UniProtKB/Swiss-Prot annotation:
The keyword Nucleotide-binding applies. It is found in: Cytoplasm. It catalyses: L-citrulline + L-aspartate + ATP = 2-(N(omega)-L-arginino)succinate + AMP + diphosphate + H(+). L-citrulline binds at Y85, N121, R125, S173, E258, Y270. Pathway: Amino-acid biosynthesis; L-arginine biosynthesis; L-arginine from L-ornithine and carbamoyl phosphate: step 2/3. GO terms for biological process: argininosuccinate metabolic process; L-arginine biosynthetic process; urea cycle. L-aspartate binds at T117, N121, D122. Keywords: Amino-acid biosynthesis, Arginine biosynthesis, ATP-binding, Cytoplasm, Ligase, Nucleotide-binding. This is Argininosuccinate synthase. One of its GO terms (cellular component) is cytoplasm. CDD domains: ASS. The lineage of its organism: Bacteria, Bacillati, Bacillota, Bacilli, Bacillales. It comes from the Bacteria. ATP binds at A8, Y9, S10, G11, G12, L13, D14, T15, S16, G115.
Amino acid sequence: MKEKIVLAYSGGLDTSVAVQWLIDKGYDVVACCLDVGEGKDLDEVYQKALDMGAIECYIIDATEEFSDEYVSYAIKGNLMYENTYPVVSALSRPLISKKLVEIAEKTDAVGIAHGCTGKGNDQVRFEVAIKALNPELKVFAPVRAWGWSREEEIDYAIQHNIPVPINHDSPYSIDQNLWGRANECGILEDPYAAPPADAFDLTREIEDTPDTPDEIVIHFEKGLPVSIDDKAFPLDELILYLNDLAGKHGIGRIDHVENRLVGIKSREIYETPGAEVILKAHKALETITLTKDVAHFKPVIEKQFAEQTYNGLWFSPLTDSLKLFIDSTQEHVTGDVRVKLFKGNATVNGRRSPYSLYNEKLATYTKEDAFNQEAAVGFIEIYGLPTEVNSMLHGGYSNEQ
């Protein structure tokens, strides 16, 4: 009886070729494809996996789990790798790994295979997560093992009649989920080349966007968006709704050269229309609901959390601790944020909360002012005392300094 390998199957070039490669190595292949909100035709993927030679194919709808257990932390934690990339692909990898391990244990497979190259981040994310969840499982990386170029891989697919939606003229590598879309390879590898129109799918060119704006009010409960214009949505449906609405306005395009975990720089094109709107609105609500010290310290945690996610360390004690901190900060992040969507921009123009720390009577410069300005004299004297003492001792600062 042949040993079984569970393959993370997407229906794309790498994993389609990997099915045949694993069969040639003497394994039975159990394909596993997750829906994390990318809108893929899963019936087609299922049939394609079987046509490629897989003995079984599991199709798992994990969209709700992805939004509730993973994207929720991207929102509450304002996760942005290098202050630019909202960890789109990285965020789905721990969930995919979790499901692969569950299928491997269910089918008595000896290991798990993925279609990642030896140059990317995903190989690290998958393998570290799998070993964290079940150290006994073997991990196979066919693409890394055979060492082919993208062109050689395409040629192999053509020779073996493996249908893939890719060719030498359009060799993009695309990954998409609920939180956004990532695109690389081909002409995009030249960091000076402008991305062609066919590199985008979720967002319109600015020239093709409406000439009138849309204005929406997003309601948040404990850090998460729950309704738009008083219409309630589950989180996954709310994100998909905003992907459509904001994408129509050309919002969410990111052209980024990032520092990969494996030590190289990579040019990536991201489309994150819903994420951009939600994160801007969430940050705006935090400005009136978080205390000054929390608001100033939270970005330190956010940066570390984003790096943990990007670097494949979702299943780790540190990430568990970071989640607890983030959750504790969101207890009062409840309220409404008004956002205007127009010509590539999501602009916050209003925010309110029953837990707002903004006191209009203290902030106003009108006759309603309740701020005790006389108290400023003593505050300034004490606040500036260390500076004054230092200048008395060392002679003060000259104008040249």
